Amino acid sequence: MLTLRSYVGDRWVEGGGTPQTLLNPATEDPLATASSEGVDLAAALDHARARGGPALRALSFAERGAMLGTIAKAIQAHRDELLDLAVANGGNTRSDAKFDVEGAVATLSAYAELGAALGAARYLTDGEGLQLGRSPRFHGQHVGVPRTGVAVHVNAFNFPAWGFAEKAATALLAGMPVVSKPATSSAMVAHRIMQIVVEAKILPEGALSLLVGNARELPALLGAQDVLAFTGSGDTGARLRALPNVIRESVRVNVEADSLNAAVLGPDVEQGSDMYELFLKDVQRDITQKAGQKCTAIRRVVVPAAIAGAVRDDLVELLGAVRVGNPARDDVRMGPLATATQLADARAGVERLAAEGRLAFGSAAPLAAAGVDAGKGYFISPVLVAFEAGAAATAVHDREVFGPVASLLPYSGDAAEAVAIVARGNGGLVSSLYSDDGDWLQDAVFGIAPHHGRIFLGHPKIELSPGPGTVLPQLVHGGPGRAGGGEELGGPRGLAFYMQRVALEGARPVIGKLLGPQPG
């Protein structure tokens, strides 16, 4: 059985004590062990600050971006191996595994291109320079400079490749060294990516470290120049924000947490139309892709009451065609949940929703999955819960069931009512709207906008749209309230978290000489 090791201080270190065992969630067979016991976390952080930070800050954006491009190519060269690991350790179908691994490559490549566009500069100018007085020589310019600490990334179990890449790409391009902590249950993919990067000798010493096993006191060791980016539950995010050192040192923290994402069908959309079929396709995909274990997955399906029955029947038909089982089989469309804990949480969540609504498809009951021994694996069927009144429901607006579970909520067709229902989620990463009615869209978009980081406007004429569940590196990822209040990616916007914005005030020629030529 494989032993995963941490990569800290530019060497591989095996943890001691009693390790955690990583399983195949479809068969429950043990695959690997991981432990962080005995790893000197303070020394790992100091090494990143002392060696990785100065080396990265000495490079231009173009040079940093070139390294990201090389990492993307290295991962792509090992694509099939990584897909196999994602199937075995993550319970992903091959299609789901591609969604993760190819998403990592695409994000790294996007930030490599951004680095090339930013060119020879090492600092990021923020807006145009300002004349501060009667004389044009009295000048001001806002500038982003890399922070001199270390970026600690605590990633979720559901996207071990993309989660690693999307955080590391922005930090490294900004000029900050990274210590990446993958979720232990699915860490084999991130561990192998780290091996690939180390073997290829792409990055300067100290620029990238990996900690496997328990994070232990890692967040408690951060100081004023460090940053912490966390993806996971809202409860854990709140505990991290409340750490004494985080409060005392004003450690910069980004949290991407729970989200009750909604998909709203406009009153103008007729059953059988192209828009209607797109809506069904997006909802069905978000319920079943990665067994619903996506932070961006549609959880609340809000439809006009007049066609709620038809939508329910059509979704039931689509979900009934989904074969659940061992994702190593070609005929399986949906694999298991990642861990026994996730399965228990999902079952409890389904039971809570079903206590208020009605199970239209699936249940929390044990499932006979294809290609696995009876009683093995962390499987649950796709679940659709139908509610009689969208606005009156409570649990559906309060509890995210992190699995292949969605709730169907009727509304009158009025945009204001749809906005009120969606807003009950108390902040989300993304919600989607499907309508050709411009007036309805105007009210709906700007009604739900304050509650979201992204709004997806579904339309059948958008070719190759990946749907609302896909996070694109060019657009921000995050959201207010329940979603954590954070923001990642968004092209150059993603660099701001890792940089200090400083206002330079003085003689224009002096400031111009300090900054040098800037990208146009």
Identify what each model region corresponds to.
Residues 1-136, 321, 338, 347:
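N-terminal Rossmann-like NAD(P)+-binding subdomain of aldehyde/semialdehyde dehydrogenases
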Residues 25, 41, 61, 272-276, ...:
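Residues at or immediately preceding the N-termini of alpha-helices
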Residues 26-33, 202-205, 224-227, 306, ...:
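Conserved C-terminal structural/oligomerization subdomain of aldehyde/semialdehyde dehydrogenase
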Residues 28, 64, 86, 175, ...:
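Residue-level signal for inorganic ion chemistry
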Residues 30-37, 53-57, 132, 152-153, ...:
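Short, well-ordered beta-strand elements within core beta-sheets of diverse protein domains
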Residues 108, 190-193, 221, 240, ...:
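Hydrophobic packing residues within well-ordered alpha-helices of enzyme cores
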Residues 120-278, 309, 412, 486:
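Rossmann-like NAD(P) dinucleotide-binding subdomain of oxidoreductase/dehydrogenase enzymes
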Residues 199-201, 225-227, 235-392, 414-420, ...:
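ALDH superfamily catalytic-core signature
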